[in-house]
């Protein structure tokens, strides 16, 4: 059995799940990030499954999502990459808040996510060596190139607009896989993707798999590609994530 609560950590609304009676017991912990236009509540099945596996789970609402949503859907659709960047930047304070609660067992902290959350998890892993392992479900590690086709912040038609686009996207380069293959390959990493994904192309994670393989950094890599699956989490994907964290965290 598990328990689950809504609360704030570092002023960020989160879902907090854990095995029953172990709220204040140090446990291995997974921070799991949800997808775009969704919320931690919608993705709470991950919290349930991982807590049932004996883990502590923290699921933050992304900026302008869940209880942080401003109500302006049109504005949010143009803020995908800014939201991704802020979510990655918030990891440091979120991790510190978890540690301050004395919730971590032997610093065993992992990250995972789906879609935008999978990108968040990969970016955090690229910059934070304290992350023990990572699960990326239907995501990408190549932000600056994908931003031209997936929820672009604007469609540049003038030189000024191109400069504005570049200024929005440029900070993402510090977080993407291109410059951090060593960091992404030096600890266990799960990549899962539906091969018929109609939102985030499966080629995004296949590209990362190839880059890690070609540089000899795939020794700790687990890949799972599911034929016939579009942009959704399947029962098999959930099982793969739970099995992965059980084994590596």
Question: What do the PLM-derived regions correspond to, one by one?
Answer:
Residues 206, 214-249:
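C-terminal catalytic histidine-bearing segment of alpha/beta-hydrolase fold enzymes
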Residues 49-73:
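Conserved alpha/beta-hydrolase
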Residues 36-48:
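The serine-hydrolase catalytic nucleophile loop
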Residues 1-25:
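N-terminal cap/lid segment of alpha/beta-hydrolase-fold proteins
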Residues 94-152:
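Primarily recognizes the serine-hydrolase "nucleophile elbow" in alpha/beta-hydrolase
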Residues 78-102:
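Alpha/beta-hydrolase active-site loop
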Residues 145-206:
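The feature captures the conserved acid-bearing segment of alpha/beta-hydrolase catalytic domains
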Residues 25-35:
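Short beta-strand element of the alpha/beta-hydrolase
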């Amino acid at each position: 059995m598990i328990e689950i609560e809504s609360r704030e950590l570092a002023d960020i609304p989160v879902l907090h799940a854990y095995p029953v009676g172990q709220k204040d017991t140090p446990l291995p912990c997974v921070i799991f990030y949800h997808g775009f236009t969704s919320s931690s509540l919608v993705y709470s099945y991950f919290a349930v499954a991982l807590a049932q596996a004996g883990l502590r789970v923290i699921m933050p609402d992304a900026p302008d999502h869940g209880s942080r949503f401003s109500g302006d859907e049109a504005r949010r659709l143009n803020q995908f990459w800014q939201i991704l960047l802020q979510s990655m930047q918030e990891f440091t304070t979120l991790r510190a808040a978890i540690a301050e609660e004395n919730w971590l067992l032997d610093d065993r902290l992992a990250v995972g996510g789906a879609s935008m959350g999978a990108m968040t998890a990969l970016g955090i892993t690229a910059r934070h060596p304290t992350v023990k392992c990572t699960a990326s479900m239907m995501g990408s590690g190549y932000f600056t190139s994908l931003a031209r086709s997936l929820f672009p912040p604007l469609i540049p038609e003038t030189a000024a607009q191109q400069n504005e686009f570049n200024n929005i996207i440029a900070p993402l380069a510090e977080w993407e896989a291109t410059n951090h293959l060593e960091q992404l390959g030096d600890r266990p990493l799960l990549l899962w993707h539906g091969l018929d994904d109609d939102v985030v192309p499966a080629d995004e994670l296949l590209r990362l798999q190839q880059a890690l393989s070609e540089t000899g950094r795939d020794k700790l890599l687990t890949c799972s590609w599911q034929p016939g699956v579009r942009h959704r989490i399947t029962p098999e994907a959930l099982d793969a994530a739970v099995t992965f964290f059980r084994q590596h965290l």
